Amino acid sequence: GYRLLLCNSDESLKREKELIDDLLSYKIAALLIVPVDGDEGSNKEYLDHIRSTGTPVVCVDREIEGIHCDGVYIDNYTACYEVTKDVLTRGYRNIAYMADPPIYRPGCDRLRGFRDACKEFGVTVPQENIFLAPIEDTKSLNAFLHDVARRDVPPKAIINFVRGWDYTMLQALHSAGLRVPEDVYLTGLDDDNTLPNFGYSMQYLPSVIDFSEAAAKLLIERVEAGNALPEPERRIFTTHMKPIFERKVTLPKPDAAPTEADEKEK
């Protein structure tokens, strides 16, 4: 068997490098990493160097441009496109979008999926309804949520791709007297298992477990390959997302007529 060592870089490029150095001092068999890649840059050259010395490196979720390491990634574009299309199909036009800024590859792909779905439906979402900031910027996140919740006409749907959003969002909506999902239809990624409390949930395919197992299996394959590592492999999981309603719920009145597909679902 293997012993698993866990570390958290807190999105710090310097800390990530220090942690990797510390792990290498234990003569680790391989490195599984969600790499830092943003305003500070990335440790791309260092990760490539580690792999070149014979230590397998498998990147997960966040793809660094031009990296020469194995990677297992989620198709963030399709996921966000399908979530946005679901909202627009239900007839909602006054919507809000929350996500990480388009600095990392996932943020870029998600924003592109959102915009492409809106373009397909001929919908223009005003900039004041779009929040793009890292999860660490809790002050801006709170300000945005309280602003949209207290407008004369608040959004009828909020598409969220920011991690750890359950408590902050629900608190903002509740303080403004808004109900979920009767007044605001919440949807998106990483809902921290909040939505089932309101009678529905988001189904992710592949599941987090399936995705994690794929990354672990690739890592083991590389460890068992020894020093003769094959060319890096880039595995992309096409991700599908859709709401699953566990019971009959009342959603906000649509701004436009729902499409035929949504009418059949109901």
What are these regions, as identified by a protein language model?
Residues 70-97, 112-116, 138-146, 166, ...:
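Hydrophobic alpha-helical segments within soluble ligand-binding/sensing domains
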